[in-house]
């Protein structure tokens, strides 16, 4: 039987949120892999359908985070909710002062998301320092997700891109729960 990442599954993290059942399993899986690989206080960003930001301490406390619309959802909203804006391919344009609508939309979507990322990460770092006593310079920022490569060159706060973070986290959770699953079967 498949292993479902849900409440009760061993992760090695201590979930410090109001209702742990509300935390998406993808966020937990990414946090498990990042905490396993890096023993620093962490901010894990997943550039997927939504862009999620998660804070994890070096002791494995999952503190919570922020959820923003992903770049593709934002592009879809512009196309579907405006009268004349076209569908655009997601590409990093060369300029922010754009001479046409398509490049203007691409600029707003990509550079806007880069700015959102920098702002949220900076705010989370400040909270980790002020509310949790973490050393600002020790906080490592890990990014993953299909759209991470698109923003990596423009987002200075990202320390490393981990393309396999979710898969690595699933393997780690499977290993932590393997013996428990054998007893049930």
Task: Describe each PLM feature range.
Residues 44, 51-56:
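Short beta-strand scaffold segments in enzyme catalytic cores
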Residues 1-43, 59-185:
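Nucleotide/phosphate-binding catalytic cleft detector across ATP-hydrolyzing
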Residues 49-51, 149:
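Gly/Ser/Thr-rich loops at beta-strand to alpha-helix junctions
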């Amino acid at each position: 039987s498949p292993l479902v990442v849900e409440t009760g599954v061993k992760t090695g993290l201590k979930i410090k949120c109001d209702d742990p059942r509300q935390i998406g399993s993808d966020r937990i899986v990414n946090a498990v892999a990042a905490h396993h690989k890096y023993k620093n206080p962490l901010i894990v960003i997943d550039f997927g359908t939504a862009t999620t930001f998660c804070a994890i301490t070096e002791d494995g406390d999952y503190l919570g985070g922020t959820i923003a619309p992903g770049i593709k959802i934002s592009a879809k909203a512009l196309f579907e909710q405006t009268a004349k804006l076209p569908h655009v391919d997601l590409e990093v344009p060369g300029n922010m002062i754009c001479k046409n609508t398509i490049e203007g939309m691409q600029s707003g979507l990509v550079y806007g998301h880069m700015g959102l990322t920098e702002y949220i990460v900076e705010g989370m770092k400040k909270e980790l320092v002020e509310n949790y006593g973490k050393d600002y310079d020790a906080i490592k920022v890990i990014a993953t997700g299909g759209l991470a490569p698109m923003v990596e060159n423009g987002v200075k706060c990202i320390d490393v891109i981990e393309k396999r973070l979710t898969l690595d986290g699933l393997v780690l959770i499977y290993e932590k729960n393997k013996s428990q699953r054998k007893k049930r079967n």
